[in-house]
């Protein structure tokens, strides 16, 4: 069996700010966009979470829950510097590191000789090193598969770790809510519940054929995770699959001309970002997102070989007139999906 560690920093952005300014340590603190500009919360410290402040929450709502909240815009350079140091600590134990974001990563320590080969002790040492070298805390989950390692990292937060051994997998899964499986949101959970399926234990008694009938390919994922099967490898060279930019507006817009001007502005930023990862600007798809004042949204995409502003404007124009239904627009976003590297190489050969 493999030995997988999932390391998750504790309220990372806020923790960096509290470390660098101890006056922030015991007060409700959040990182995010201002309520005047209709921003959202990126992360919140534990004093703020006690008031119900959560990541991805509109900043205005956060202030309603916690009027005394201290809000900071964030310092991405500081967070990236800390993240790089953390990555260097991981590399002392294994080259098999799959970063998921600045503040979390999977590690495969199956072949590591450190700490006598004990994944539990390796996780403990990593957390101790992060604490002593960066004055930050991390939580960790240790399990034979990625799915359970990630769940385990949530069970002893903050500044703790949890181990699921091979012998503990089945007992652990029996009562595990299906909502813990990635991809099971509120809608899917409701459909599962209608079938009498609430826990992984319920799925274990349910025919795979029925799951496939009701949920298609995702039915197999549900069945496998509920049986403790997750064959996904750690991917050290995890490839970026998309690039996007978006802007939340200070006031809703109701006229196409304002949206068009914003898309012109966002396009320049998207092109700049894309050139950093794909100088040729070759892509697989490009698209537009509009979020309305009622928080519903529409995303429209076209298959397109190269980043193209005219096409993006046409997509946006169609979405504006077909999906808006006279609602105000509060957010506009542009994104591209990158080509699979093998496919891109083949296309270049074909074009050459």
From Swiss-Prot:
- Domain UmuC residue range list: 4-185
- What InterPro entries does the entry give? DNA/RNA_pol_sf (IPR043502), DNA_pol_Y-fam_lit_finger_sf (IPR036775), DNA_pol_Y-fam_little_finger (IPR017961), DNA_polymerase-Y (IPR050116), DNApol_IV (IPR022880), IMS_HHH_1 (IPR053848), Rev_trsase/Diguanyl_cyclase (IPR043128), UmuC (IPR001126)
Q: Which domain of life is it from?
A: Bacteria
Q: Which reaction does it catalyse?
A: DNA(n) + a 2'-deoxyribonucleoside 5'-triphosphate = DNA(n+1) + diphosphate
Where are the active-site residues found?
Answer: 104
* Swiss-Prot/TrEMBL site (Substrate discrimination) positions: 13
Cofactor note as given: Binds 2 magnesium ions per subunit.
> Which residues are involved in binding Mg(2+)?
8, 103
The EC number of this protein is 2.7.7.7
GO MF terms here are: damaged DNA binding; DNA-directed DNA polymerase activity; magnesium ion binding
Keyword Phosphoprotein included in the entry's annotation = no
Q: Which GO terms describe its cellular component?
A: cytoplasm
Which pairs of positions does the record mark as disulfide bonds? none
- UniProt signal peptide: none
- Functional description taken from the UniProt entry: Poorly processive, error-prone DNA polymerase involved in untargeted mutagenesis. Copies undamaged DNA at stalled replication forks, which arise in vivo from mismatched or misaligned primer ends. These misaligned primers can be extended by PolIV. Exhibits no 3'-5' exonuclease (proofreading) activity. May be involved in translesional synthesis, in conjunction with the beta clamp from PolIII.
Matching PANTHER family: DNA POLYMERASE KAPPA (PTHR11076:SF33), DNA REPAIR POLYMERASE UMUC / TRANSFERASE FAMILY MEMBER (PTHR11076)
Q: What is this protein called?
A: DNA polymerase IV
Q: Which organism is this protein's natural source? A: Yersinia pestis
